[in-house]
Design a protein with these regions (language model features):
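Conserved beta-strand->loop/alpha-helix structural units within folded catalytic cores of enzymes
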Residues: 1, 9, 96-98, 104
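N-terminal subdomain of nucleotide-sugar transferases
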Residues: 1-39, 44-47, 87-89, 113-116
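Conserved donor sugar-nucleotide recognition element shared by glycan-biosynthetic enzymes
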Residues: 11, 72-75
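Short aromatic-enriched loop/helix-cap "lid" or pocket-rim segments at secondary-structure transitions
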Residues: 12-13, 40-45, 59-63, 105-107, ...
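N-terminal strand-loop element at the rim of the active site
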Residues: 25-73, 82
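Short N-terminal targeting/anchoring amphipathic segment
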Residues: 82-102, 116-120
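Active-site proximal beta-strand in glycosyltransferases
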Residues: 92-94, 110-157
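Membrane-proximal helix-turn-helix segments that form the acceptor-binding/catalytic region
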Residues: 112, 140-185
Length: 185
């Protein structure tokens, strides 16, 4: 699972190159949201399911971006249909990124269907609302306890305080859903 089906940064490079390498010995699927699709994936037999969404920052409809960036039932249903074709005993769902176009709603599916789930963390969004343990406004490392009152009232986000509040809501949803997964490794 990765936001993009192409390399647009370090995390996507790891996700796509891992999928290409694993495809030499295993049946590999890449579930993603943002096109284009890296043609190397299909050349080595990776089955790509790319739903063709825009990432949150580039969706012109800001209301849709704000709401679908927190929880996306449409994408969740597509992911659920994919997992219904796989065996929870024989499959591992490997998450790379889900904060630019996908959402934690996918973890609700892995929990419900009892899939083993692996997460490669490329940032700190599982632990810090702004993803960096960093106060971007003061240009210094942040030592606040994530999601504490001190954290939530601090304007530390790289973009804006409303963005920080939105990210905090997203993190609360994410942590709630991830806690339901009994097989996250």
């Amino acid at each position: 699972v990765n936001d993009c089906a192409h390399i647009e940064g370090g995390a996507a490079s790891v996700a796509i190159n891992s999928a290409i390498g694993l495809a030499k010995h295993y049946s590999v699927y890449l579930f993603s949201a943002v096109q284009p699709i890296d043609r190397r994936l299909e050349e080595v037999g990776v089955r790509v399911i790319c739903i063709g969404k825009k990432d949150i920052l580039h969706d012109e409809n800001r209301i849709r971006a704000i709401s679908k960036g927190l929880w996306d039932n449409e994408t969740k249903r597509v992911f659920e249909r994919l997992l219904a074709t796989l065996s929870p005993v024989e499959s591992i769902i490997h998450f790379h990124t889900w904060t630019k176009a996908l959402t934690a709603s996918l973890y609700a599916v892995t929990a419900k269907m009892d899939f083993k789930t692996v997460i490669t963390l490329h940032d700190f969004f599982c632990f810090c609302p702004n993803g960096g343990f960093y106060d971007y406004q003061r240009n210094e490392i942040c030592f606040r306890k994530p999601m504490s009152y001190s954290c939530l009232t601090c304007n530390c986000d790289v973009r804006s305080y409303p963005q920080k509040i939105w990210r905090s809501i997203r993190m609360a949803i994410q942590n709630h859903v991830m806690a339901k997964n009994k097989k996250i490794y």
